[in-house]
UniProtKB/Swiss-Prot annotation:
Gene name of the encoded protein: rplI
Keywords of the record: Ribonucleoprotein, Ribosomal protein, RNA-binding, rRNA-binding
Upper lineage: Bacteria, Bacillati, Actinomycetota, Actinomycetes, Frankiales
GO biological process, one term: translation
Gene3D superfamilies: Ribosomal protein L9, C-terminal domain, Ribosomal protein L9, N-terminal domain
Protein name: Large ribosomal subunit protein bL9
Function: Binds to the 23S rRNA.
Length: 148
């Protein structure tokens, strides 16, 4: 069965991709959940138009992502959190906490899903946090966790 994906499907493809899947998988899972539509000639033409518009938008988004990366590059973010005697935090610092601290420090609004914490932040100290702004642009934020 030939389908056009409307959403990202792990292991299968991204929106706009034309994929060949088993009939049951397409009919019982992908189409009812609106992850895909049937691949007709009209739908394929429409997908090509959408892809052209998306590529033009991606160029604009790349410039915007580079601008935000420049803003984040020189930003030092301080986050205060409750901690015990040995510097161990009560809980941990989450991506949402990092976004809130960046905004409070005068940085741009970020999406918490774009913030990557490679290891959980569970103690006081200095950390480097990666922010994926665009597939080609990743910014780093210097985060200082201090005791409240």
């Amino acid at each position: 069965m030939k389908l056009i994906l409307t959403q990202e499907v792990p292991g299968l493809g991204s929106p706009g991709d034309i994929v060949e899947v088993a009939n049951g998988y397409g009919r019982n899972y992908l189409v009812p959940r609106r992850y895909a539509i049937l691949a007709t000639k009209g739908a394929e033409r429409q997908v090509e138009q959408i892809k052209r518009a998306r590529s033009a938008r991606a160029v604009r988004d790349l410039g915007h992502a580079q601008e935000i990366a420049g803003q984040l590059g020189g930003l030092k973010v301080e986050l205060t959190s409750r901690a015990g005697k040995e510097g161990r935090l009560f809980g941990s610092v989450t991506a949402a906490d990092v976004v809130e601290a960046v905004t409070a420090a005068g940085g741009p609004e970020l999406d918490r899903r774009r913030v990557e914490l490679t290891t959980p932040i569970k103690s006081l100290g200095a950390y480097t946090v990666a922010v994926h702004l665009h597939p080609e642009v990743t910014a780093t934020v210097k985060l200082q966790v201090t005791q409240a």
